Curated annotation (Swiss-Prot):
Catalysed transformations (reactions): (6R)-NADHX = (6S)-NADHX; (6R)-NADPHX = (6S)-NADPHX
Protein name, as recorded: NAD(P)H-hydrate epimerase
Cofactor(s) this protein cannot do without: K(+)
Compartment annotation: Mitochondrion; Secreted
Binding site for K(+): N116, D180, S216
Cofactor binding note: Binds 1 potassium ion per subunit.
SUPFAM superfamilies for the chain: YjeF N-terminal domain-like
UniProt-annotated binding residues for (6S)-NADPHX: N115, N116, G117, G118, D119, G184, F185, S186, F187, K188, G189, A190, D213
Residue runs in coiled coils: none
The protein's assembly and partners: Homodimer. Interacts with apoa1a. Binds to high-density lipoprotein.
Recorded GO MF terms: metal ion binding; NAD(P)HX epimerase activity; nucleotide binding
Amino acid sequence: MLGVRALFGIGLLVTSRGGFVLTHTRACSSAASNIYSKHLTHRPTCTMANTGVKYLGQEEAQQIDEELFSDFSFSVDQLMELAGLSCATAVAKGYPVTSLLKSPARVLVICGPGNNGGDGLVCARHLKLFGYEPSVLYPKRPNKQLFQNLSIQCQKMEIPFLTEMPEADLIDEAYSLVVDAIFGFSFKGAVREPFGEILSQLKKITVPIASVDIPSGWDVEKGCPDGIQPDMLISLTAPKKSAALFKGRFHFLGGRFVPPVLEQKYQLNLPQYPGTECVFQLN
């Protein structure tokens, strides 16, 4: 095992094993741009899109997921792979390797105990293939073969796993970006440790945060004004209602797997993805 500072030339232990419709067009947030500009050599182009995509409540989002698994015979790992690839693609579009001041382009991927965490593991693997240097923090690993397999895949690609959450100043020093894959749309109730402390540290960092589906700690429908404020949100399947409160620079839609009949049933009004793209920028 190595220390994070030793691994990155700076010390933490790591192991290499181990519904309503909203139509909006909004300019990229200048405040967010100022906060994160010191981590970029240039600001990526912000492509605007005007779309009337439907924003989902928690119950409706769960119903769509259940139908994908039951009526349409998708498997969990199948959708997880598509979702994780979408997340990595969105990150690559918003924060190209060549735009980051730090080299190599290190990304901290923080994974929760559920499917959102699985999306994060897939995202980390694809980020590695895209030329980034991801590290994974996975403090509560489920005892399920699917998640064990995803962890092994990362380990085989020499993606290090941290043993504890770095302090905010160390994250700012070592990383260019944090991917928040802790809690998804099914999250309810109070945040339990160690995730409470993790979210506390994330609120202190200055490097950009890219949240998967929901900013962790947010109410799926009401948001959380005192919670983390990501620079990027990657909504999966369709945005959730809390996404209307997102104030970051990049809002992407990912998970290009919704059958047309299901889209019509729930009146999702999904945008037309260009060409073979697996993500679509909503703001």
